[in-house]
Swiss-Prot record:
Keyword Magnesium: yes
Source lineage: Bacteria, Pseudomonadati, Pseudomonadota, Gammaproteobacteria, Vibrionales
Database matches in InterPro entries: PEP_COase, PEP_COase_bac/pln-type, PEP_COase_Lys_AS, PEPCASE_His_AS, Pyrv/PenolPyrv_kinase-like_dom
Family: Belongs to the PEPCase type 1 family.
Active-site residues per Swiss-Prot or TrEMBL entry: 138, 543
Gene3D superfamilies: Phosphoenolpyruvate/pyruvate domain (1.20.1440.90)
A molecular function GO annotation: phosphoenolpyruvate carboxylase activity
GO biological process: carbon fixation; oxaloacetate metabolic process; tricarboxylic acid cycle
EC nos: 4.1.1.31
Keywords: Carbon dioxide fixation, Lyase, Magnesium
UniProt protein name: Phosphoenolpyruvate carboxylase
Protein function: Forms oxaloacetate, a four-carbon dicarboxylic acid source for the tricarboxylic acid cycle.
Catalytic activity of the protein: oxaloacetate + phosphate = phosphoenolpyruvate + hydrogencarbonate
Length: 876
């Protein structure tokens, strides 16, 4: 590894050495020697030695079944430890340029100053700053919570070892602790034995809040406040709420039959319980700190005649929180609850705590007010009384099925067979009516009843407990109105954001037309109060049309929605359903946000954080602070220094690129007769369905083919065999087509001057760097019928041609020239991922030869899947 990454190299080497000790102790010198032989052969094979590559293949083929799992685990664990060392390095004091993000906020203020942006405009943009991260339980988080907790403790040890004044005995003790943690991880089961329930997933999300965000958000706000003070002369108002959290865990029932209304209710109770539990810890700490006597009349009034007024108020809060925990416990167990007052909204915490804060300032104790008390006040604004706001997500046809069954029962026809205009007339008429629509004597089918019961659960909650109701596969205005009607019929007493999710290429292209139709309806305009949320689907659009075409459709849809909302004086919040991989919209946060259309971040940012990306971006408080800094600086920059409007010739060329890339993508995925058999044979797609990752089935329709596969297993499968097909197919071909048509200069101009286009090419470069055509060929030879080999050859040839086309436009000699650290990081991992790929191909071969599944082979296969996911730094 390059010497400028010496501190990171040292940590990786130390962790690898300690892992080696653990393997020796657990399995003996012989197995460790075998692992080391494979590692060395992988390294020399990577350097270009065909002899060593063949030797590596033979070494892996010759492994007996009982050695497959420990060898796979050795490489998998090393990659997990490397990820931890790398994540730690980004926040360590030894972090080098190109590895760590520069100070994003300070860089932003320099740019604002250079562009003469006024203080007034900047202050206004800061006041409007809104970052809402939505934690989702997509089944991409391979690592079990058990393993994640151990990795967090390893991070703490690395932090201690970095201290320059650490004593020899303390260093020895910390290194010993590291070795213990690595041994604990080795002897723990790396793979879940059972598929997690939706409740397990929600608990995982709450653990992220407790272990990282509970500290990370107030830390970010404290740092951000100081930067604003330094640059603008005024900090964040005490009641500012620039960051808040939502969740889909326990609310996302799209294609997941296990998320029922009962589960949603249970998750919401658990969310409140966890919030009360965390606030109780804060309050207990404040009781120990705030022993002051002097106070204002307001605090004296709240405290009564107690000698220590602040403690008296805090003890009242402690009683409230204890009673809340007791009440929620009883509710979760289905027992009778007490009638004592409990925490129901954030104001119950805010008012007494804020009174204490103001009193301390008024009495000359501002320095005390600005300590732990301020952090707790910031938490009250960020997390409320419910920790996270829960979104509800359901597929559009589930709502129309309710109305169809109902209208047939009422004898007025079949709603599903009506024209769109007839549906809208019926829905608006019912929404405007004061009489109920649902008859008392109607007994719906179980599926329909579940949708109705979900709406009733929503109606029982407080508004601040809920985010938005997301309609997946939204296609028409009636899809949105139908949800409003069902919520109204359930007795929902507040206005809930109903958010259409436009996912496919056609739906994205029609999104403006759908919203214009909704805005033309008087009832709808009156109800939404000039605020609209729309969700842009990244994963399904890319699966439908390929990344280039989907990317342009997403951009065009955002632009059109911004335009129509501006004309209608409606405040638009765009909700981005991004994933961790390029094929699902993943990109470095800062670049991705700055590549969006002008004005698309005016209403703030709402974005899903999914699976393993939650851990990479938010898993440690310090890492979360970095992520929030990047989000905040990008949103402020996009709003104060918007990117250029694309020139007409750029748009025209993007239309061509989109059309050509979509056709190229679909010709393979839909038009190639051998594609589905090839996909099933050359990737672990069928085996992945057995992996106990998330609570949600891998297919929307269990009997369907590729088209019914969810976007996550679709991309996950291709990432495993290193062809990563969905993240590049069609894009390079379209670029080469445009070069051949004489547009190279225009492409180069777009690359230089248009953030949208340059970000797309940067994402492609990263994907190409992670691809391994040689490994994909090995999977073909080991696993597929010879009749399918020509398709594999064709795809790999296309990949090589695409790489040349992109490098040509960028005037680069090799991939990721502008990101040497990213390239180096991938190179380092490849030495450990390659043996896992070869092991996986061998395991798939052996498994598919057997009539009955061998638990031994299945376990080893699961370990390789987890290891490759860790090495690729993204799954689905």
């Amino acid at each position: 590894m390059n010497e400028k990454y010496a501190a990171l190299k040292s940590n990786v080497s130390m962790l690898g050495h300690l892992l080696g000790n653990t393997i020796r102790d657990a399995h003996g010198e012989e197995l460790l020697a075998k692992v080391e032989t494979i590692r060395k052969l992988s390294k020399t094979a990577r350097a270009g030695s065909d002899n060593d590559r063949n030797a590596l293949i033979e070494e892996i083929k010759s492994l007996p079944n009982d050695q497959l799992t420990p060898v796979a685990r050795a490489f998998s664990q090393f990659l997990n430890l490397t990820n931890m060392a790398e994540q730690y390095h980004t926040i360590s004091r030894h972090c080098e340029e190109h590895v760590c993000e520069p100070d994003a906020i300070s860089s932003l203020f320099s740019k604002l100053s250079q562009n003469n942006i006024s203080k007034l405009d900047t202050v206004q943009a800061v006041r409007e700053l809104n970052i809402e991260l939505v934690l989702t339980a997509h089944p991409t988080e391979i690592a079990r919570r058990t393993m994640i907790n151990k990795l967090v403790k390893i991070n703490e040890c690395l932090s201690k070892l970095e201290l320059s004044d650490i004593s020899f005995s303390e260093r020895e003790k910390t290194e010993r602790r590291l070795e213990q943690l690595i041994a604990q991880a080795w002897h723990s089961d790396v793979i879940r034995q059972e598929r997690p329930t939706p409740l397990d997933e929600a608990k995982w999300g709450f653990a992220v809040v407790e272990n990282s965000l509970w500290q990370g958000i107030p830390d970010f706000l404290r740092e951000f406040d100081q930067r604003l003070e330094n640059h603008l002369g005024e900090g964040l108002p005490i009641d500012a709420r620039p960051v808040h959290m939502s969740s889909w865990m326990g609310g996302d029932r799209d294609g997941n039959p296990f998320v029922t209304h009962t589960i949603t209710r249970e998750v919401m109770l658990l969310s409140r319980w966890k919030a009360a539990d965390l606030y109780l810890k804060d309050v207990n700490e404040l009781i120990s700190e705030l022993s002051m006597v002097k106070c204002t009349d307001e605090v004296r009034k709240l405290a009564g005649d107690q000698h220590e007024p602040y403690r008296a108020i805090l003890k009242q809060l402690r009683t409230l929180l204890n009673d809340t925990l007791e009440n929620l416990d009883a509710q979760m167990k289905g027992e009778l609850t007490n009638n004592k007052p409990i925490l129901r909204n954030a104001e119950q915490l805010w008012l007494p705590l804020h009174a204490c804060y103001q009193s301390l300032h008024a009495c000359g104790m501002g320095i005390i007010a600005e300590g732990s008390l301020l952090d707790t006040l910031r938490r009250v604004k960020a997390f409320g009384a419910h920790l996270v706001r829960l979104d509800i997500r359901q597929e559009s046809t589930r709502h129309s099925n309710v109305l169809s069954e109902l209208t047939r029962y009422l004898g007025i026809g079949d709603y599903d067979q009506w024209s769109e205009q007839d549906k809208i007339s019926f829905l608006v008429n019912e929404l405007s009516s004061k009489r109920p629509l649902l008859p008392r004597d109607w007994t719906p089918t179980a599926e329909v009843q579940e949708v109705i019961d979900t709406c009733k659960i929503v109606a029982e909650q407080s508004k601040e407990a809920l985010g938005s109701y997301v309609i997946s596969m939204a296609r028409t205005a009636s899809d949105v109105l139908a949800v409003h009607l069902l919520l109204q019929e359930a007795g929902c007493p507040f206005r809930m954001d109903v958010c259409p999710l436009f996912e496919t290429l056609d739906d994205l292209n029609r999104s403006k037309e759908v919203m214009e139709q909704l805005f033309s309806i008087d009832w709808y305009r009156g109800f939404i109060q000039n605020h609209q949320m729309v969700m842009i689907g990244y994963s399904d659009s890319a699966k439908d049309a390929g990344v280039m075409s989907a990317g342009w459709a997403q951009y065009s849809a955002m632009e059109a929605l911004v335009d129509v909302c501006e004309k209608e004086s409606i405040e638009l919040t765009l909700f981005h359903g991004r994933g961790g991989t390029i094929g699902r919209g993943g990109a470095p946060a800062h670049a991705a946000l700055l590549s969006q259309p002008p004005k698309s971040l005016k209403g703030g940012l709402r974005v899903t954080e999914q699976g393993e990306m939650i851990r990479f971006k938010l898993g440690l408080p310090e890492v979360a602070v970095n992520s929030f800094n990047l989000y905040a600086s990008a949103i402020l920059e996009a709003n104060l220094l918007p990117p250029p409007e694309p020139k007409q010739e750029w748009r025209d060329l993007m239309e061509v690129l989109s059309e050509v890339s979509c056709e190229a993508y679909r010709n393979i995925v839909r038009g190639e007769k051998d594609f589905v058999p090839y996909f099933r044979a050359a990737t672990p797609e069928l085996e992945l369905g057995k992996l106990p990752l998330g609570s949600r089935p891998a297919k929307r329709n269990p009997n369907g083919g590729v088209e019914s596969l969810r976007a996550i297993p679709w991309i996950f499968s291709w990432s495993q065999n290193r062809l990563v097909l969905p993240a590049w197919l069609g894009a390079g071909e379209a670029i080469q087509y445009s070069i051949d048509k004489g547009h190279q200069e225009l492409l180069e101009e777009m690359c230089r001057e248009w953030p949208f286009f340059s970000t797309r090419l940067g994402m492609l470069e990263m994907v190409y760097t992670k691809c391994n055509p040689q490994m994909s060929e090995y999977y073909d030879q080991r696993l597929t019928d010879k009749s399918l080999w020509p398709l594999g050859v064709r795809l790999r040839n296309q990949l090589q041609a695409d790489i040349k086309a992109v490098l040509n436009v960028e005037n680069s000699d090799h991939l990721m020239e502008s990101d040497p650290w990213g390239s180096e990081s991938i190179r380092l991992r490849n030495i450990y991922v390659d043996p896992l790929n070869m092991l996986q191909a061998e395991l798939l071969y052996r498994t598919r030869q057997q009539e009955e599944t061998s638990p031994e082979l299945e376990e080893a296969l699961m370990v390789t899947i987890a290891g490759i996911a860790a090495g690729m730094r993204n799954t689905g």
